[in-house]
């Protein structure tokens, strides 16, 4: 699913009022959309936590799962990634997804 397809499908969607099944479908489509749009080569978090890994390559291990206890449903999508030193972390789209990282860089340039 591309970003444009995702935007069209969910233009009137409200996650706060969605049924569990609809939210699950929404989260799956978020995963699909970000995976279709691609990942960055290096980790680049805007947050302080794990910022020591900024600029480092990572291995994509798997999708994070609320069923496996990786995170809460509302925190999805996230992916489990692994750094060269063996540390595994949950990564948000803004840490590793091209779409989000590029958007953030554009927004930061507007204000700097």
Feature map (PLM): residue ranges:
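Acidic, low-complexity, intrinsically disordered interaction modules
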Residues: 10, 15-104
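Short acidic DE-rich linear segments
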Residues: 109-112
């Amino acid at each position: 699913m591309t970003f444009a397809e995702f935007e069209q499908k969910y233009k009137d969607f409200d996650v706060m009022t969605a049924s569990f099944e609809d939210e699950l479908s929404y989260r799956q489509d978020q995963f699909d959309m970000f995976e279709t749009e691609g990942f960055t080569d290096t980790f680049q978090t805007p947050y302080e936590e794990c910022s020591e890994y900024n600029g480092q390559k990572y291995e994509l291990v798997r999708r994070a799962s609320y069923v496996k206890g990786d995170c809460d449903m509302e925190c999805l999508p996230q992916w489990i990634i692994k750094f060269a030193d063996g540390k595994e972390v949950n990564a948000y789209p803004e840490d590793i997804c091209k779409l989000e990282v590029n958007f953030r860089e554009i927004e930061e340039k507007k204000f700097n």
